[in-house]
Amino acid sequence: MMMNAFFPAMALIVLVGCSTPPPVQKAQRVKGDPLRSLNMEALCKDQAGKRYNTGEQKIDVTAFEQFQGSYEMRGYTFRKEQFVCSFDADGHFLHLSMR
C-alpha cells in the first residue's frame, strides 16, 4: 500500500520541480576605460612596429574586442600584413600574433 502512494508522490515532486522557469541570466558587461584602451593601442602599435620593422605611424589598429578575461586588438601594416595583439583582463600585453 505504501509503495502505491510513493510513486505518484515522487512523480508529482519531479513535475513541480521542472515546471519552475530558470532565472534570467544577464551577461556582465564592463564599461571600457578610454585611457586604458588608448594605452593598449599605443603598446600594440609599438610592439607591431618592432615586429614588422616599421614605425608606429605606419600601423593601423582597426578593431578592439573585449572577451570574458582578455582583450584583442586587430590591425595591419602599410604593407597590409595583419596582426592581433592580445591583452589580459588588466590590460597587460600578452603577445602579438601575425595573421
UniProtKB/Swiss-Prot annotation:
A lipid is attached at C18 (N-palmitoyl cysteine). A lipid is attached at C18 (S-diacylglycerol cysteine). InterPro entries: YsaB-like. GO terms for cellular component: plasma membrane. Residues 1-17 form the signal peptide. It is a lipid-anchor. The keyword Ligase does not apply. This is Uncharacterized lipoprotein YsaB. It comes from Escherichia coli O6:H1 (strain CFT073 / ATCC 700928 / UPEC). The gene is ysaB.
